[in-house]
Amino acid sequence: MTEVRRRGRPGQQEPSAQKGAQALERGIAILQYLEKSGGSSSVSDISLNLDLPLSTTFRLLKVLEGADFVYQDSQLGWWHIGLGAFNIGSAYIHNRDVLSVGGPFMRRLMLMSGETVNVAIRNGNEAVLIGQQECKSMVRMCAPLGSRLPLHASGAGKALLYPLPAEELVDVIVKTGLQRFTPTTIVDLPVLQRNLDEARACGYSIDQEEHVTGLNCIASAVYDDVGSVVAAISISGPASRLTPDRFVSQGELVRETARNISTALGLKPQAD
């Protein structure tokens, strides 16, 4: 007599279902491995560390790429966590963390600086804009949410870089390269390292028309309760208004805001 299995009842899985579950588990394992690897890795490293055939690994990466969970760097061929993963994680980000905790601080910074305030997080070897508080000025600089920013040539990107240990910092820069976007983009590694040393010392980074001509940005790192960098907060404005003579005063405002958000996230203030 043939057994009739009701929908939803537990029972032995069909071979196709077993294969589907296995593929899902492997896809999740790939995303978890990329996350633990700083957001990016080569297909051969993924295959080796997850003990998967190279062809299977590549096929799974292509499926994940189709859903925008990963993307492949056209220069190095490395695979990176994509915006699809960010969009799913943004539900968590929206309900807890920098945006929900930092909202009032962002608005205060916008009012005091007179410039648009942005929040960015690191996504592999790029910074991604996840939050914004537009200023009231008729002329204002606003990038769309989800915009990708180069780590070496943006205020937020450099604020995500300068807290990193020296070895990790160099490793990230080597992976990303030093692409020139404007005449003032820093494309020399020793010069960038000195620039980041200065940013670390004063607590904020400066992008002086290094990514977009006519746009200046000042940013500072935001830390969680264990002292890990979780985001960067920045102000951006036209170079004609956010001028070099205002960098120090505005930088101090940005630094103070980043510290306040970090404290609200649970970071214990360090004794002087």
UniProtKB/Swiss-Prot annotation:
- Summary of the function given for this chain in its UniProt record: Negative regulator of allantoin and glyoxylate utilization operons. Binds to the gcl promoter and to the allS-allA intergenic region.
Do you know which PANTHER family this protein is assigned to?
Answer: HELIX-TURN-HELIX TRANSCRIPTIONAL REGULATOR, ICLR FAMILY, HTH-TYPE TRANSCRIPTIONAL REPRESSOR ALLR
Indicate whether Metal-binding appears among the record's keywords.
no
Please name every pair of cysteines joined by a disulfide bond in this record: none
Ranges for domain IclR-ED come to 98-267
Keywords on record: DNA-binding, Repressor, Transcription, Transcription regulation
Which species is this UniProt entry from?
Klebsiella pneumoniae
Residue ranges of the annotated DNA-binding region, renumbered to this chain:
43-62
Protein name (record): HTH-type transcriptional repressor AllR
Q: Where is this region: Disordered?
A: 1-20
The family database entries (SMART domains) matched by this protein are listed as: HTH_ICLR
Residue ranges annotated for the HTH iclR-type domain, each copy included? 21-83
